């Protein structure tokens, strides 16, 4: 049986931590930043942990 391929679209969007959590960058930091406060922009910059059900699906896509 051939090796399982990684879904590169998923690999570009998430990363795994050493403990196995799946991290993703939030939305809202691409454009229209001039009306957002510095506090809001700092909060949006942080990476978030995916929810359990979504993380399970992502790990399947990553192989």
UniProtKB/Swiss-Prot annotation:
Species annotation: Bifidobacterium animalis subsp. lactis (strain AD011)
GO biological process: translation
Keywords assigned: Ribonucleoprotein, Ribosomal protein
Family from the record: Belongs to the bacterial ribosomal protein bL35 family.
Keyword Ribosomal protein: yes
Native organism taxonomy: Bacteria, Bacillati, Actinomycetota, Actinomycetes, Bifidobacteriales
Region called Disordered, residue ranges: 26-50
Superkingdom of source: Bacteria
GO molecular function: structural constituent of ribosome
Protein name: Large ribosomal subunit protein bL35
GO cellular-component term (any): ribosome
């Amino acid at each position: 049986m051939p090796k399982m391929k990684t879904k590169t679209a998923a690999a570009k969007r998430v990363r795994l931590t050493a403990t196995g959590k799946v991290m993703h960058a939030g939305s809202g930091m691409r454009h229209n930043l001039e009306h957002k406060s510095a506090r809001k922009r700092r909060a949006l910059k942080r990476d978030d942990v995916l929810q359990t059900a979504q993380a399970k699906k992502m790990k399947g896509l990553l192989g």
